[in-house]
């Protein structure tokens, strides 16, 4: 480095001071900004406010709606699969002895899951989709809700049905998972448009 003589002209010394001090000021300002705005854990911030669409579909109708909703909300999509898939005979609601009829007659029925939807702790908002069976959610939805800790999560039911309403579905699901924050569910057609889904999500304040 260049050695600057002790004796400098006033002009030369002024130039030196102008060169040194601004950098000192900038460095000090940067330190102050660092104290004012502490470092944020970026990986943690990226996991905040994540949304999941988890759904059960016996015939494929709810699948179409769930995919559309995931697209609108930019959410991850996971299917709730039964360990034993439902056949057409299982879904015959006219038959009181069909598998679905027997399950829905028993509030304690919990059909086994065929897959594990892990990582629930990474999500803040979870849409839970299903077809309406006997004016409420299929029993496997209760199995799903009891399979993980949803404490503090925002849960939003959505359902498909040709004509049946949701009945007391919201209240029944809340009893199964009381520590979650539930928003009102909605029954929709499998062909509900993206515009309608966006409007609904906006109504929810999400």
PLM features: residue spans?
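Extreme N-terminal basic, low-complexity initiation segments
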Residues: 1-12
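Cationic, low-complexity basic patches in intrinsically disordered or flexible, solvent-exposed regions
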Residues: 13-18, 37
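N-terminal beta1-alpha1-beta2 submodule of the flavodoxin-like/Rossmannoid cofactor-binding fold
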Residues: 27, 38-125, 135-137, 142, ...
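Short, conserved loop/helix-junction motifs that constitute active-site signature segments
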Residues: 120, 146-152, 176-177
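Glycine-rich, N-terminal phosphate-binding loop of Rossmann-like dinucleotide-binding domains
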Residues: 130-131
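Short, glycine-/small-residue-rich phosphate/pyrophosphate-handling segment
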Residues: 156-192
């Amino acid at each position: 480095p260049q050695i600057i003589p002790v004796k400098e002209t006033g002009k030369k010394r002024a130039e030196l001071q102008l060169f040194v001090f601004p950098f000192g000021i900038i460095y000090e300002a940067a330190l102050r900004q660092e104290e004012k705005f502490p470092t944020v854990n970026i990986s943690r911030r990226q996991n905040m406010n994540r949304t999941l669409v988890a759904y059960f579909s016996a015939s494929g109708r709810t699948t179409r709606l769930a995919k559309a909703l995931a697209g609108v909300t930019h959410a991850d999509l996971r299917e709730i699969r039964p360990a034993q898939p439902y056949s057409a005979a299982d879904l015959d609601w006219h038959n009181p002895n069909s598998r679905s009829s027997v399950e829905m007659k028993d509030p304690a029925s919990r059909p086994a899951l065929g897959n594990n939807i892990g990582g629930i702790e990474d999500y803040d908002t979870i849409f839970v989709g299903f077809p309406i069976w006997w004016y409420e959610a299929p029993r496997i939805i209760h199995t799903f809700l009891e399979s993980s800790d949803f404490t503090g999560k925002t849960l939003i039911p959505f359902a498909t049905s040709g004509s049946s309403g949701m009945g007391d579905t919201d209240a029944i699901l809340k009893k199964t998972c009381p520590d979650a924050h539930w928003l009102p569910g909605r029954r929709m057609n499998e062909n509900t448009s993206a515009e309608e889904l966006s409007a609904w999500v906006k109504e929810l304040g999400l």
